[in-house]
Every structure is written in C-alpha cells, then in structure tokens.
C-alpha cells in the first residue's frame, strides 16, 4: 500500500489563472487567432490546450501579422517590445503578473533615488529579460552569493535590490545576506518580492518532506518555480522528480517506498496532479490524503483592454493601442490589488 500525500497549496496561482483567462477571453471576444508572445505560462499542457482553442504562440512580434490581437505572457516584456507593438498598431493585452509589475515599479523607484540597482535572479529567464528591459538604467544581475562577491562596485555605494518572483526563498536570503555583508548601505524588500504563491508552495513542500519517502513535482522543465520545488526535496535528502504528468511515472521509483509526497508548480493544472495519482494507482493499492496548509483566496483583476477588444470587435474598429496602454498604466495600482 502506497500513501500519497498532497501538498497544500499546489498548482495554479492567481497570476497564472489571470493570464490563462486573458487568452481565453480574448479568443471568445475576437475569435481565433489570438497571438501570444512567449508561452503564456511555462506549462506545455496549458499551452497545447490554448493552441487547440486558436491561440498562436510566437517568440517575436515580427511573427505577428498586422492588426492581430497580441497577448504578452505572464512573465512580462521589455519596454522595447511594448514600443514595437505600439509602432505596429497591434492590439495588445498585457498578461504580465501584477506581482512582476510591482517589481518593475520598485526597481524604477530605487534608481530614481540614486541607488545602484541589483537584480537577484536567473539569467535568461523571461521574467528577468522583461525586468531588465523595463528599467531605464544600469542593473547588475546576480544569481548567487558568489556572484555578489565578484561585483566590481565600491562597498560604500548606496545599493538597492529587487528579485525575480519565482526564486528559492532560502537561496535568495543567502544572496541578500551577501549583499548586506559587501555593502554598507543596502535597501530592498527582503524576500517579499518572491510571490506569495512561490513562498507558500515551497513551505508546503518542506512540510511534505517531513512525512514522505519520495517527492513528485508536477511541472514543466522550463518552469522556474517547479524546479525550485524539486530542489527542496533533494536538499531534504529525498529522491525527487519533476514530471509533466502521470505518463512519466517510472515504477522503479516506488520500490521500497511507503509514502509519496505530491505537489505541483504554480503553472501546472490540477488535472495533471490527478493523472499522476491515477498512474500510481495502476501500480497497486493507494491511499490519498492532503496536508493542512495555506488556503489561497487571492485573485487579480483582468486588464481593461479586454473590454476594448469586445468593443472593437462589435464596431469593426481598430483598437487604439496607445490609449489602451495608457489606461493599462493608469490601472496598474488597481490591477495589483489582491482580492479575497
């Protein structure tokens, strides 16, 4: 008999739910195709489901035909991308997570106060590329305490830091500690820039590890937050695997295993978790229980540009992208509200 213990919380966060809903509603209002720059979230199942509905995923705006509705992914984009869309007159709906937008605003504010800005994150991640491109000024990217030590910046320089939202909480704390050790004047948000969902899921996996012999994380290989969950299991000394769904289960993993801890990254839908449970059931008898944990009631408002898409479709007029972008900026403070 294998016991499966489910982490709580797990799976979709508010930013992912919002991003998927934006694409769904855009398709409902204007019909296919709707173009999406980059994967809307890092999960192949989600992307394939939206493709089947008529979403077309591209990496560059040059791949978008003139006049076609375009959605920016939850990870955010550089200002140059926004400008290119405006110059081409593309109707844009920005699905950037409000918590990522918050990081952009913090970075700009720190620079405006004359501080040297340090961004903690993983080079090459779409969120990092977007953040670097949203801040008009020099930004020093570091991903580890060792990289902090190699920064060629005088120790008495006033510095500020911001962070990628999907980092390991513990790793980020070590980088922040290195910054405070190297510089005499450091300000920043501690780990509060790491989003609530990332922190909650990491804490839940740590609790899961205390009761499990094996950790399974449902998520895609390019999902930063999913990889961090697997790393926590490994750090706790448990065999830990990142899998897309139940089809990737290997029976060998369960030899001598009594209790399996099961969780999912913030971009993985619950149906994939259930597919893993089904696959384990095929190996023999199982019981399933769920840990007590944080109940997430956060939701983010959809951007007002979706309403413009509906009006544009009804009147057969072109969306004024400049006006939409202005309204989006004006509503940023409202978009970032966390609602129960």
Swiss-Prot record:
Residues 331-340 have a biased composition (Polar residues). Pathway: Isoprenoid biosynthesis; dimethylallyl diphosphate biosynthesis; dimethylallyl diphosphate from (2E)-4-hydroxy-3-methylbutenyl diphosphate: step 1/1; Isoprenoid biosynthesis; isopentenyl diphosphate biosynthesis via DXP pathway; isopentenyl diphosphate from 1-deoxy-D-xylulose 5-phosphate: step 6/6. Its cofactor is [4Fe-4S] cluster. Dimethylallyl diphosphate binds at residues 42, 75, 125, 223-225, 267. InterPro entries: LytB/IspH. (2E)-4-hydroxy-3-methylbut-2-enyl diphosphate binds at residues 42, 75, 125, 165, 223-225, 267. Its EC number is 1.17.7.4. Binds 1 [4Fe-4S] cluster per subunit. The active site is at residue 127. Belongs to the IspH family. This is 4-hydroxy-3-methylbut-2-enyl diphosphate reductase. It comes from Zymomonas mobilis subsp. mobilis (strain ATCC 31821 / ZM4 / CP4).
